[in-house]
Amino acid sequence: MIEQIKSSEIKKFIEKNPNTVLLHVRKEDEWNTVGKPISDSLGIKNFFITISQDSGFIESVKKEINKENQILVMCAAGGRSIIAANLLQNEGYNTYNVSDGFSGNGQDLGWKNYGLPTN
């Protein structure tokens, strides 16, 4: 089962888990129109790898991210990221779903609206 993390909890999570990375799985056109998170100022690396059918998602992640990392997986509102987090957990990765995503999920603010750094 994937642990759910709200954007409001991310800074505290990173403090406790310095080996954390942020994996953003939205499509590139979404990054360009809505914005994208910048996690460098929080002391963690950003990875932008889109999840879609037959996209080679797992292989792309394997090339970029170590299995020793804690991976915060994010999309717009938490739906695609939970799918990605489950796929990666099945491959042996330590994944956590950012449940309110980048833009919020109707209950919680999301990365952007919580005031975390964006581009």
Where are these regions (language model features)?
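Rhodanese-like catalytic fold shared by cysteine-dependent sulfurtransferases
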Residues: 1-20, 28-70, 81-119
